[in-house]
Amino acid sequence: MKYILAILVLLMVACKPDKKYHASEKLQSGSAAIKDIVAFQKELDATFKNPNSSPLPDRFRKDFEGLDFFAPDTTYVVKARFERTPDAVPFLMPSTTDEKTREIVYGIAHFQLNGVEHQLEIYQSLDLISQKQYRDYLFLPFLDETNGAETYGGGRYIDLTIPEGDTITIDFNKAYNPYCVYNKKYSCPLVPRQNYLRTSVRAGVKAFVKD
């Protein structure tokens, strides 16, 4: 979350960076992974309840009890082969507004999920790497077959860090919605079509329903 909040700041919207959420580079045991996922959910709920960090307008935040998450499921914690792309060309990633962020494909994750082989591009923000606290941050936006029904139609995000070796752990239980889902004042990067997963990812934050 800290990574994408920083991107939102760069897109000239009013938001305040908060604590980061990213997958551990060491695949955890089932019980430890579940505890980690639950801790992530609690911390994300706390962020949304806090008036200084919440993307929710006051009219929604005052009655906010918690986000709607899928139940923690370690099936969606995958250890992917990480293919670095040192020759990738920088590009401008469009957003939900006229603003764009400067990104580069840092690498490609190759993994199996739900019995199918997949790959996702993982990005690094060229606008953030000059800042010490974001030098190791990577951004993974993705689409899947739950979008538009169980989850937000525009896809979700996951924050990662640069791995030391040739594998990277992706915990889809830590997938969260772009902030523009909750408040149109935010400008959010659009998920590239090549990051569409042809499977249902029933993990992470569900679609936001305004009561």
Model-predicted segments: where are they?
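C-terminal motif of bacterial Sec signal peptides marking the signal peptidase cleavage site
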Residues: 11-14
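Post-signal-peptide N-terminal segment of Sec-exported extracytoplasmic proteins
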Residues: 32-69
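Mid-length scaffold segments of soluble, non-membrane domains
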Residues: 86-153
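Bacterial signal peptide processing site
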Residues: 16-19
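C-terminal partner/receptor-binding element of secreted or periplasmic proteins
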Residues: 186-211
